[in-house]
Amino acid sequence: MAAQTTEKLQKLDLNGQSGDAKADAPAAGQAEAGEAEEDSDDEKDDGNAAPEAGAGGAAKKKKRKSKKKKKGGAKVQSSPPRVPVSNLFPNNQYPEGEIVEYTNENSYRTTNEEKRYLDRMNNDFLQEYRQAAEVHRQVRQYAQKNIKPGQTLTEIAEGIEDAVRALTGHQGLEEGDNLKGGMGFPCGLSINHCAAHYTPNAGNKMVLQQGDVMKVDFGAQINGRIVDSAFTMTFDPVYDPLLEAVKDATNTGIREAGIDVRMSDIGAAIQEAMESYEIELNGTMYPVKCIRNLNGHNIDQHVIHGGKSVPIVKGGDQTKMEEGETFAIETFGSTGKGYVREDMETSHYALVPDAPSVPLRLSSAKNLLNVINKNFGTLPFCRRYLDRLGQDKYLLGLNNLVSSGIVQDYPPLCDIKGSYTAQFEHVQIPSHSHP
């Protein structure tokens, strides 16, 4: 990192951790958000309980003071998480993300670009993102501590999704409520050779195993401002080198990203970092390969995949990052071919933005499109979400919407069977100065 100057540029990593899988291990220089993550609320409560255990008036005073603080909105989250973060931060001042400094090469702007930045970086924009980021952080921290082998994927996914809905204060059962806040997209739980876009459909009985490598990828959103962050969980240290490689690659992408940086340069740096690692499995050494046909992406309001891609290999897009855009910096590593194909049963779907007007002959398709528009808009959804809204016998209509180009399906993406894949991801907003 270059020396600081008065004209230095900065970028906001809203997740507060540059790809670190441990939610309770803050990154250096992360004073405000990091402190909140390091000490859990339960630990703070335990610390306050000890002085109050003694006899006398002092103990009573401390007890009364503690109650007064809670009445004003004590920062205490339940387990499992169910307290809306707006109750924990009554002044709507949510923790800032980690500030990552730019190098000197990106220390200039042009007037038009600064104007676009000022248009984007309004206070509501940042506050909505910070609120969504705090929701994601608290749910992520709980998930990392409580997901264990033996749980079903449905149990894990619904636990995360219920927590996100509770913390945003939007259950999404009334028309339009999910557009105000809640899940940014379905909770992905992709295991082993499956790298992305897998969540259990109704009736799925799959159980997490001790030797599994599971990617946990979920989004939280406030007013369509989606925080898209992912981590990988393992329960056998043999997979540590794979996780270290992908985590290092994501951190590298975060450091290299910035205003006016070409996407291809970010991809080249990511690939160099990741492919310097190897992993030994059953006595055989495997190079860790970037999954070359998976990318990071920019995020628009209510749209998870914007028009820009952030490659994770060299030779990619020459497009530049712009000030005030929102990017999901994500990397995928594999012990297999480093290339994924569509496989297994589809669960993820999303309404195509500006989809063409196509006459629908099936009444089930017309009715389902109305449900999708009113409840999800262009936010991704899965079959379980339709079940949750009381929809049934919708598959024929859903497939008709897909074949008509109105809804996009997102099948699971898998490398070769027997391989292992990992993912780490965080959201970042390149900005001219720390708002």
From Swiss-Prot:
One of its GO terms (biological process) is proteolysis. A divalent metal cation 2 binds at D228, H297, E330, E425. It is an enzyme of class 3 (hydrolase). Pfam families: Peptidase_M24. Residues 59-73 have a biased composition (Basic residues). It catalyses: Release of N-terminal amino acids, preferentially methionine, from peptides and arylamides. Residues 1-92 are annotated as: Disordered. Its main location: cytoplasm. Binds 2 divalent metal cations per subunit. Has a high-affinity and a low affinity metal-binding site. The true nature of the physiological cofactor is under debate. The enzyme is active with cobalt, zinc, manganese or divalent iron ions. Most likely, methionine aminopeptidases function as mononuclear Fe(2+)-metalloproteases under physiological conditions, and the catalytically relevant metal-binding site has been assigned to the histidine-containing high-affinity site. GO terms for molecular function: initiator methionyl aminopeptidase activity; metal ion binding; metalloaminopeptidase activity. It is found in: Cytoplasm. Belongs to the peptidase M24A family. Methionine aminopeptidase eukaryotic type 2 subfamily. This is Methionine aminopeptidase 2-2.
